[in-house]
Design a protein with these regions (language model features):
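Bacterial N-terminal signal peptides that target proteins for export
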Residues: 2-11
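Bacterial N-terminal signal peptides
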Residues: 10-20
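Juxtamembrane cytosolic interface motif at the C-terminal end of transmembrane helices
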Residues: 21-25
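Short, low-complexity N-terminal intrinsically disordered segments enriched in polar/charged residues
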Residues: 26-83, 90
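A solvent-exposed, acidic/Ser-Thr-rich amphipathic alpha-helical stretch
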Residues: 67-140
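Short beta-strand edge/turn micro-motifs at domain boundaries
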Residues: 145-153, 157, 161-195
Length: 196
């Protein structure tokens, strides 16, 4: 796995302004929050966030299998609120198995529908997180860190309770939230291309 730290002004300009801005602190009591918000992200934090995402997906599947849809939906909502940046604004989310006109899910409701289904506004969603996932593996092709923003790209391999395997190409981008934790602000997932 390759990790890159970018210092180039050209690439930094492509990332959120918050990643390169230095906050002006007007009052001493604001300093701890601002310092946390703008603290540089580390590779260990990115890898921990990826593991937390995989563990959450398995937990939602297990919750569905053991306690039913309502419990899985509640847990999925908690995961979205904790791991994704929907509370900060739109998230650029392109799930693996979506079709036009609902390919992109910039709202929390759209993401929740993708993960657990059951939303009439998203009739093609059957609940990706409800597919019996029991194990996962993340293999990064690379991680790019610029200040308080990070991007990773690689593969996520998932196994269900029967041992069936699904591999997806995955790109995530994070920024640090006001609580100091990483928040997913971009999530792109697709099935690997297979030349015929």
């Amino acid at each position: 796995m390759k990790s890159f730290k970018i210092r180039s002004a050209a690439l930094a300009a492509l990332l959120p302004l918050a990643a390169i801005a230095t906050p002006a602190v007007a009052h001493d009591h604001a300093a701890p929050k601002a310092a946390t918000l703008y603290a540089p992200i580390t590779q260990a934090e990115v890898e921990a966030a990826q593991q937390a995402w995989g563990n959450a997906l398995v937990a939602i599947s297990t919750e569905y299998d053991t306690k039913g849809f309502a419990a899985a939906k509640t847990l999925a909502g908690q995961v979205l609120d904790g791991a994704y940046g929907y509370g900060m604004g739109p998230v650029l989310f392109k799930p693996t198995l979506t079709v036009a006109p609902q390919t992109f899910r910039t709202s929390r409701d759209g993401a929740l529908a993708y993960f657990v289904g059951g939303d009439k506004a998203f009739p093609n969603d059957s609940g990706f997180a409800l597919k019996g996932w029991r194990k996962f593996q993340i293999d990064n092709a690379g991680i790019v860190i610029t200040g308080n923003s990070a991007i990773s790209m690689g593969n996520v391999t998932l196994w269900d309770a029967k041992g069936n395997m699904t591999k997806v190409d995955k790109t995530w981008a994070w920024t640090r939230g006001a609580d100091g934790n990483l928040k997913i602000v971009l999530h792109h997932s697709s099935l690997p291309y297979s030349a015929k």
